From Swiss-Prot:
Highest taxon in the source lineage: Eukaryota
InterPro entries: GDA1_CD39_NTPase
Any single Pfam family the record assigns to this protein: GDA1_CD39
Official protein name in the record: Probable guanosine-diphosphatase
Location in the cell: Golgi apparatus membrane
Location of the region described as Disordered in the Swiss-Prot/TrEMBL record: 34-55
Topological domain spans for side Lumenal: 27-503
PROSITE patterns attached to this UniProt entry: GDA1_CD39_NTPASE
Gene coding for it: gda1
MF terms in GO: GDP phosphatase activity; ribonucleoside triphosphate phosphatase activity; UDP phosphatase activity
Length: 503
């Protein structure tokens, strides 16, 4: 009996073993991977401390978006982490890194014919992305590169070669999905988009958009190296005669924006060639042109120190200026600009800065700000709401102790003090690093005069108008990058997860 039972157990064990062998034999040699909807990460890693599931089950709980700002003076990356715990994405974290500054700029445009070198210049930024995006999210974290005014000025042929090289390197070296060409994944960003994205960033962080309340929005003035942008939501007074109220005129300046369930009718314009570095070049060039007109035959003055009222007193600056083909000084000249020996020449510098604005240009659609560009009057259509000025506006005022909010009259006083030279700088002694900044930058007087001219003479803001400077709001970087990254969280933004089967 015991032997029969033992035989039965042996037979049963043999059958089970055979079944296991058959299952192993028919199973696939590679593991099967589930498919994921377009734009969703292939991971179920939980959010840290916010919530355990997304508000919308069609969206992933956590999303990363990468944005490279290829500016005229350098390139910067923003690595954003969002959660979808609520009806709209919430920014949880941001990592920011920029290329090392170098003479002549470290932007993509500085590489000119070396397209591959330009593409490789982004590698340090991508290393930051590789370190800060967890491996399980990399294949579903979209990246876009937006070049601004500097590359725009390089011309269509050279700039396109650089853009193609950048796309190729990102697609072949790194695991992140690159936004498609059709959706502007690697492109020279249109100036109107640049300004509007900055407006979205600012008002999103201020909590003025994206929520249920229709609160008044803030204006945004962004001063870059090659261009400056203005974006605001004008409010037109009702007609006194009882007719239809005035509206924003049709044209390229009008930007209709749908965001967070609201419609915004914005005025925007990007003034190409009116960034701070472009303004410096224009002012220095105007001085050289005046000298050339006075002495067109004898050019020995080029080797002598050239007086410049926009250089600080008893300071000098070596400047390289390029001239177009056919110009007597083409292709370039190197000169030494020197400031006055004593006293302030702020008024003279202000005059040179105002001339660059071309206020006398024909205005085909009134009213105009400068250079013949239509703009609704800020005093009439945006008199009371907040005005945020950032980028170089911030960089040239905050180090000198300006508060987060000040009037244009206070900016005018600062400009006069700075242009007065070392004898006037005693008030900066108590501000850490201010005196070193002033002594290291002979063009401080020029920079502040251009800013003052742009805001007061160009945009026609009264001296009593208050402006706010900021580099961050709620500890988040300002600029256009966040505003441009928010749309990337949508499934229709031009990318799919880069999911590969494991061999």
């Amino acid at each position: 009996m015991a032997q029969t039972q033992r035989s039965r157990y042996l037979k049963t064990g043999a059958i089970v073993a055979a079944l296991l062998l058959m299952l192993l034999w028919i199973s696939p040699s590679r593991p099967m991977h589930p498919s994921f909807p377009q734009g969703q990460p292939s991971t179920s890693a939980p959010a840290k401390g916010k919530c355990s599931k997304p508000h919308d089950p069609k969206k992933p709980l956590i999303q990363y978006a990468l944005m490279i700002d290829a500016g005229s003076q350098g390139s910067r990356i923003h690595v954003y982490r969002f959660n979808n715990c609520g009806p709209s994405p919430e920014l949880e974290d941001e990592v920011f890194f920029q290329t090392e500054p170098k003479k002549g700029g470290s932007g993509l445009s500085s590489y000119k014919e070396d397209a591959e070198g330009a593409a490789k210049s982004l590698d340090p930024l991508m290393e930051v992305a590789m370190k800060n995006v967890p491996d399980e999210y990399k294949s579903c974290s979209p990246i876009a590169v937006k070049a601004t005014a500097g590359l725009r000025m390089l011309g269509p042929e050279l700039s396109q070669k650089i853009l193609d090289a950048v796309r190729n390197r990102l697609e072949t070296v790194y695991p992140f999905p690159v936004v498609s060409k059709e959706k502007g994944g690697v492109e020279i960003m249109d100036g109107s988009d640049e300004g509007v994205y900055a407006w979205i960033t600012t008002n999103y962080l201020l909590g003025k958009i994206g929520g249920p309340d229709e609160t008044p929005t803030a204006a945004v003035f962004d001063l870059g190296g090659g261009s400056t942008q203005i974006v605001f939501q004008p409010t037109f007074p009702k007609s006194k005669s009882g007719g239809m109220p005035e509206r924003l005129s049709e044209g390229d300046h009008k930007y209709d924006l749908q965001f967070g369930g609201r419609h915004f009718e914005l005025y925007q314009h990007s003034h190409l060639g009116y960034g701070l570095m472009a303004a410096r070049k224009a002012i220095h060039t105007s001085i050289i042109e005046n000298m050339l007109a006075s002495s067109p035959k004898d050019l020995s003055w080029l080797k002598q120190p050239i007086p410049n009222p926009c250089i600080g007193p008893e300071m000098e600056k070596n400047v390289t200026l390029e001239f177009p083909e056919g110009h007597k000084l083409a292709p370039e000249v190197q000169v030494t600009m020197v400031g006055p020996k004593v006293g302030s020449t702020a008024a003279q510098c202000r005059g040179l800065a105002e001339k660059t604005l071309n206020k006398e240009a024909a205005c085909t659609l009134a009213p105009c700000s400068f250079n013949g560009v239509h703009q609704p009057s800020l005093e009439k259509t945006f008199a009371r709401e907040d005005v945020y000025i950032f980028s170089y506006f911030y960089d040239r005022t905050k180090p000198l102790g300006m508060p987060d909010s000040f009037t244009l009259d206070e900016l005018h006083q600062l400009t006069s003090t700075v242009c007065g030279g070392e004898d006037s700088w005693g008030i900066f002694a108590g501000i850490e690093g201010a005196l070193k900044e002033l002594r290291d930058r002979p063009e401080w007087c020029l920079d502040l005069n251009f800013m003052m001219s742009l805001l007061h003479t160009g945009y026609e803001m009264p001296l009593s108008r208050e402006v706010k400077i900021a580099k961050k709001i709620k500890n988040r970087e300002l600029g256009w990058c966040l505003g441009a990254s928010l749309p990337l969280l949508s499934q229709e933004s031009g990318w799919t997860c880069r999911i590969k089967e494991v061999s």
